[in-house]
Amino acid sequence: MVVPQKKFANGKRNDSTKSFKPMKKPFKKTKDDVAARSEAMALQLEDVPDFPRGGGTSLSKKEREKLYEEVDAEFDADERVSKKSKGGKSKKRIPSDLDDLGLLFGGGLHGKRPRYANKITTKNISPGMKLLGVVTEVNQKDIVISLPGGLRGLVRASEVSDFTDRGIEDDENELLGDIFSVGQLVPCIVLELDDDKKEAGKRKIWLSLRLSLLHKGFSFDSFQLGMVFSANVKSIEDHGSILHFGLPSITGFIEISDDGNQESGMKTGQLIQGVVTKIDRDRKIVHLSSDPDSVAKCLTKDLSGMSFDLLIPGMMVNARVQSVLENGILFDFLTYFNGTVDLFHLKNPLSNKSWKDEYNQNKTVNARILFIDPSSRAVGLTLSPHVVCNKAPPLHVFSGDIFDEAKVVRIDKSGLLLELPSKPTPTPAYVSTYDAAGDEVTKLEKKFKEGNHIRVRVLGLKQMEGLAVGTLKESAFEGPVFTHSDVKPGMVTKAKVISVDTFGAIVQFSGGLKAMCPLRHMSEFEVTKPRKKFKVGAELVFRVLGCKSKRITVTYKKTLVKSKLPILSSYTDATEGLVTHGWITKIEKHGCFVRFYNGVQGFVPRFELGLEPGSDPDSVFHVGEVVKCRVTSAVHGTQRITLSFMIKPSSVSEDDSIKLGSIVSGIIDTITSQAVIVRVKSKSVVKGTISAEHLADHHEQAKLIMSLLRPGYELDKLLVLDIEGNNMALSSKYSLIKLAEELPSDFNQLQPNSVVHGYVCNLIENGCFVRFLGRLTGFAPRSKAIDDPKADVSESFFVGQSVRANIVDVNQEKSRITLSLKQSSCASVDASFVQEYFLMDEKISDLQSSDITKSDCSWVEKFSIGSLIKGTIQEQNDLGVVVNFDNINNVLGFIPQHHMGGATLVPGSVVNAVVLDISRAERLVDLSLRPELLNNLTKEVSNSSKKKRKRGISKELEVHQRVSAVVEIVKEQHLVLSIPEHGYTIGYASVSDYNTQKLPVKQFSTGQSVVASVKAVQNPLTSGRLLLLLDSVSGTSETSRSKRAKKKSSCEVGSVVHAEITEIKPFELRVNFGNSFRGRIHITEVNDASTSDEPFAKFRVGQSISARVVAKPCHTDIKKTQLWELSVKPAMLKDSSEFNDTQESEQLEFAAGQCVIGYVYKVDKEWVWLAVSRNVTARIFILDTSCKAHELEEFERRFPIGKAVSGYVLTYNKEKKTLRLVQRPLLFIHKSIANGGGSKTDKPDSSIPGDDDTLFIHEGDILGGRISKILPGVGGLRVQLGPYVFGRVHFTEINDSWVPDPLDGFREGQFVKCKVLEISSSSKGTWQIELSLRTSLDGMSSADHLSEDLKNNDNVCKRFERIEDLSPDMGVQGYVKNTMSKGCFIILSRTVEAKVRLSNLCDTFVKEPEKEFPVGKLVTGRVLNVEPLSKRIEVTLKTVNAGGRPKSESYDLKKLHVGDMISGRIRRVEPFGLFIDIDQTGMVGLCHISQLSDDRMENVQARYKAGESVRAKILKLDEEKKRISLGMKSSYLMNGDDDKAQPLSEDNTSMECDPINDPKSEVLAAVDDFGFQETSGGTSLVLAQVESRASIPPLEVDLDDIEETDFDSSQNQEKLLGANKDEKSKRREKQKDKEEREKKIQAAEGRLLEHHAPENADEFEKLVRSSPNSSFVWIKYMAFMLSLADIEKARSIAERALRTINIREEEEKLNIWVAYFNLENEHGNPPEESVKKVFERARQYCDPKKVYLALLGVYERTEQYKLADKLLDEMIKKFKQSCKIWLRKIQSSLKQNEEAIQSVVNRALLCLPRHKHIKFISQTAILEFKCGVADRGRSLFEGVLREYPKRTDLWSVYLDQEIRLGEDDVIRSLFERAISLSLPPKKMKFLFKKFLEYEKSVGDEERVEYVKQRAMEYANSTLA
């Protein structure tokens, strides 16, 4: 709507004449104006009223308008005069965009009408404006939207919707990309405008898509049918999606269409558009339809009272042309509003200059609202065909495209409209005057003509207009860079410097694009004054570094600009050997980071920098330096590039022996403050670096050695830690050199829970990095590095420290190694730490001697640990005594106070002392004069005259022996100990360990007792010292890992060595042999073939034995690398032949059936595991260990650990080196299976379950088995024979004798002894094994002979395996297999079955065969008939007398007389009468239909049923024909009993809350007999559920049909309402037709089985072929298979039935589905999952509601209430408008005695349609009466009768329920209320009649008369 002419943005009129002055910049707004608009936005975009307060006027409306026109005319005249007079003449100027865009704020109006159409620009857009935009980009944190006028807006992720709980900030990219798509039209609102900091003069437009802002001011009344609204998807439900409109109390909903299309692709948070289809004003729910065609075609209706606030961008309106403007059209729409359309939004985007002719006044068109400005109340419309169709205009061109043949369509004052020949359709383009003529002032009409073809280049795109912006300037076609797509990394181009700042320079290409040259790239060197380097306006040559997010970066470094080397701009371009230029971005100690083009980055390791050893990279390189580098490796997937500054690769050495972990020697070249540089001795000149920390394991010794080393000194043993180019990193640490072969250099060499040596390479706050060989590095987190959680890592370790690391985890995928450095898990297990200290002490002593000769070190040889030495006292002080030695210079002795032994020493005296310790570096000897040391020593002194007397080495001490010691001297690094128990032998122990060097050490005192272990005896490697390990240092006992012995050439595989046993383990002997070699002897390497249970009994620790080395240590396993494999088998030691590795491989060959021996090392519940050899293990399954049950029960006891067990090879897994054994011989030819032996044995056992087992099971085998399942009915037992092999024991093969319950005493999991009777293969390729548990079979009896009872009782125990073994009149026994109404089947053996007809079941009549002959019952009978060809056997179960004739034949008619009263049972009901079995006679009589009743009887079958007990009178006896005529009329029985000959009906008063079965249930009830369980009511759980789906509970009384159930037909007519007579009669007819159809089906199905019931599968196949659409037959077939325990076959029959039954027979198919439900519910594995799968399939083919009800019935009958409740909840959600579903929910709740019924009722009333409320409430009340609380039922009835007091059907049902309860006072009171109503006579007659019948049944004559009197009174009052 166009605003009044002189109103401003705030709506206030300003009468000041200053306000009418011409404005030079009408669009420029002050900061205050913007701030005011922002404030308005913050106040939720409230409109400011025209007159905020006061200011009334006395002028009328017409007078005001006239005054405004006069002022406007005067103002326009003044404006024109002032323009002309200023400067004397008007100036020519280029028309600006502001002139033809039109104003939104009153500056461009002419009279009452605007001169220009409203257009949006950056200068007039303001907060609060609503616009229609199109999504152009979906970024990680925002959305870019193209707005009208070519503007670009941004939407933050937090402004896309009103939802705050979506977690947008966690994963914005995924969320925004899911709910928005490029090209989507969206309505938005302007939040704020920001000045773009990156580009001056541009403003950022921040938008919001929140509907709470767009729909502000809307109310529920604003929603009208047919309107289009935007909404956010709040949640997705089963039936549709819940929508959010941004309004607090209004909810939307979109239902899922039938085809489900509406649901596809819809996601939570998505913004959609929909047409209002339904409005629920009660619940304030608006239903929408999101059909795109409906949304696009929907017009906004012209509603009364619509305000400006209700207009939303995107609305389609019917607009009428009001006038044509200079650059558009003015429309009015919706009666009250005006809007404009500019030239670029016309219907034809390529309109020529005559476009105005197309829009005549009052012409109506469809337009869509483009934008709305609430402040000026201006509206923009669009006629663009695509936007009107609710689609974004397509664009077929791109920025930078050049078109040589663009056609001029129209020439305007502001520019040219062109037609670009794009495909598939032309695209309009507009060229402004500036881009067409440049700075020249010229008229476009003179230069261009319409229809001309010109060359144009696309500058940009306006997506909302579908318009391209072009230029005709020549400069636009010249430059190589015009758009961002033209920019390629590495390209060289010219650019002009336009600005210079402290961060760099901004340059501009010839095409207009801008780029940045960072400060570091302005020169090769550091630039301090960039403005002097770059001059604004200078044109320079640059190289493009990259273009990311339309931001171009360039460089001016000369080396890069002029480089001729290949450009590296992507990781895929990086190939090994590529040489290119880059620049350094970061320098670290371990290398440099180098960057290339487009952000590609690589790393140069330190050894590839080409530095001299000891040089610092920072001193050689600087950040920003351009370098030439070579790619050494590239991993494209992980984007890792490794580089080298050494262009030509060089090898470390030509000597291949130098590799990681090798030992080398070298000569010191130079020494720096941090490292020692050595020249390594090799074929080529190679240098190595030894850091100061790697000179020794002890930190103090390393510093001392560093100070003593000099160039030229030779270092003999150096470990190669790492090879860095042509340099090597070396180490002189003894701990690493000693275990060089064990140090890992690759992930594959690491094994969790092993301990390895390494060194600390770096420390951080969170942990410690430990390095091994090469660059293999692990990390020890702080929690795993120190035992004390409060300790600091930096205070516990130092860089370079030797450590022992426990490998916790190895993650090769992430290349991560997790370590533990805790002393508790990494303590030393040897004395290497203190040993290294003494070795380094010797080395330091040698270094200290200026002349390394023997004479300088010879003094040490004069002293020996523990020997006596003679010396002279030099001086004495508080600490002790200093001693001089004769003929030994510069060596002193020292006796501490503790070791003076109480003697008084004076200077000059001579003493003989014991040597305790020697410090070669300090040239000091520690001595002792303690008597116990001296006295013990003198006992071993010889009588020689030598001054030097030596103690003998104690032979009693052994390695690993634990001893008690006494501290003699406490040194800084070690203790001097004596061992009193072993002659005071002197030993040495370290006070710290590798990992505790920096930690405080435990304080020891002289004389303290400690416990230690002997780790090394005196030898040259220990400097002649006995080395001990303190328990306090090790923390735990010695682990299994010990130091690895060096490999000696004398030890070879096959050599015989002498070894000493150090440890005896359960399955191996640990030995030491040779020079520090360690090995083991496996338990299988002791004896040749003996099965001794204790092979190690003859060995003891310390024993010396001879053994042969049979295998080298396994290098792949770090834990076992130190152990050689040895053997002491006699045959192995005798064999002098050459031994090699081939002998080892021969032991891995095994043949099937081969007998092998192993030793038990593990037993679990199922398997016993054996060690067969060093590398091969075996396992035996529990059932393969014995065939006796009692032995299997004691399985674990029979196989103690270490026992020798033999077995026969069944299978062999060569890959895992595992045998499968059995303990019974296998009957087949031996065959090698080491290489497979066949296709089956190639694979592991698990891959061929059961196949190998069945190959070695034969008929007649006696096996051990375990009962895995007791099958239902007469299915027998399922017995497990192997891990994956099962067999079946037939019901008749369980016991020898015929016992009533063969399964009694058996349980699942029980072990049994069984015999294989038969092995056969099924059609599926699986093996079926028939077993027997009968002890009478050969091999099954535990005694030597059978009992006499079993031998003599052949008839009882015999099993007839063939039909030929049977003959008529032979006595047989068997078990009932299944029972039907026509008879039953019995099983005589596992192969023979027989049929028993109903007439032969019993001597007397059998009323219910299923109950009297249940499945599994033991019966005895006689064979009547045998048909070998058809394999049919008929048996009778009737008993016989002595004469062999039936008892019934012994009776005679003479015993009966005419007139006698007899009792009996109805045998058969015929249309002509009843056949009655007369009790105690066995004879049958006929009662003709004429003799049944005194009245005429139409339908005999409806009144009488077979099996009912009746009384009758004998009317006639025909002895010739042996016929008896009976009569049952009442008159015949008057003199007898009062009992009438009528069926015994059920008590109608005892009603339950169970559904009533339809008539079909009687037929289908026959399936109860086929092996299914029954409930207490006798209803089948599996197949009888077929009828329950159509069942109606007795409480579900249809109130519309209530008359049918409660009254006779005459009463019904009185009760029916007149308006419903036709409808109800139709329903009654339908019900009657349905009942007749069910009866026909029942009769037909009965006839199918009348003549001959199928007895085997072939007969059933014939039957289903003849009646393929009968579900009854198919279900019978399923039941038959289930009776045979063949569940899979029953399933296959169900599947066949579903495929076979015609698709039109929906009821029959549904019957099969329900039977399928019950089948899976009983036999599924697991049942719940199996039923669910079948249920999901059934829903797709049948009526879902019926399927749900059927499954609910299954769950309720099987009392699975949790599943039933879960299903009911789902049903309520899916069918919430179904009354039946809600009633089932209430019925279920009442059954489970739940009290919260009212909440269910309330929910149901909210969901159900109103017309179903009465029915629901009344039936709920009936349920309460019958199953719940009667008072609640009364309350419900009373409530509904208050609303509908004249509904006699409600009164009738209410009365019936009260009558059923039997409270007379309540009933009579209710009747009194009913007959007091004012109802029509017919209804009152019905009530009175019901009252009268009630009183007749329970009352007396007085009450009957009372009712009659009340009826007369009513009749009289009515007639009056």
Curated annotation (Swiss-Prot):
Q: What happens when the gene is disrupted?
A: Aborted development of female gametophytes.
InterPro entries given in the database record: HAT, NA-bd_OB-fold, Rrp5, Rrp5_S1_rpt_hs11_sc8, Rrp5_S1_rpt_hs1_sc1, S1_domain, Suf, TPR-like_helical_dom_sf
Q: Which Pfam families match?
A: OB_RRP5, OB_RRP5_4th, S1, S1_RRP5, Suf
Q: Name one GO biological process term.
A: embryo sac development
- For whether the record's keyword set contains Nucleus, the answer is yes
* SMART domains, per the entry: HAT (SM00386), S1 (SM00316)
Entry annotated with the keyword Nucleus: yes
- GO molecular function (one): nucleic acid binding
Q: Where are the HAT repeats?
A: 1651-1683, 1685-1722, 1726-1758, 1759-1791, 1828-1860, 1862-1897
Q: What sequence ranges are listed for the domain S1 motif? A: 128-210, 226-291, 314-384, 400-473, 490-557, 577-646, 661-733, 753-822, 866-930, 958-1031, 1054-1129, 1153-1224, 1260-1334, 1369-1438, 1459-1529
Gene3D superfamilies reported in the protein's UniProt record:
Nucleic acid-binding proteins (2.40.50.140), Tetratricopeptide repeat domain (1.25.40.10)
Q: In which tissues is it expressed?
A: Highly expressed in flowers and at lower levels in roots, leaves, stems and siliques.
Domain of life, source organism: Eukaryota
Q: Name one GO cellular component term.
A: nucleolus
State the compartments where it is located: Nucleus, Nucleolus
Query: Which residue stretches does the UniProt record annotate as biased composition, category Basic and acidic residues?
Result: 1620-1652
| Keyword field | Nucleus, Repeat, Ribonucleoprotein, Ribosome biogenesis, rRNA processing
Show the segment(s) annotated as Disordered: 1-65, 1535-1555, 1605-1652
Role description: Involved in the biogenesis of ribosomal RNA (rRNA). Required for the formation of 5.8S rRNA. Required for normal development of female gametophytes.
Name the UniProt record assigns to this protein = rRNA biogenesis protein RRP5
Q: What is the lineage of its organism?
A: Eukaryota, Viridiplantae, Streptophyta, Embryophyta, Tracheophyta
Q: Identify the coding gene.
A: RRP5
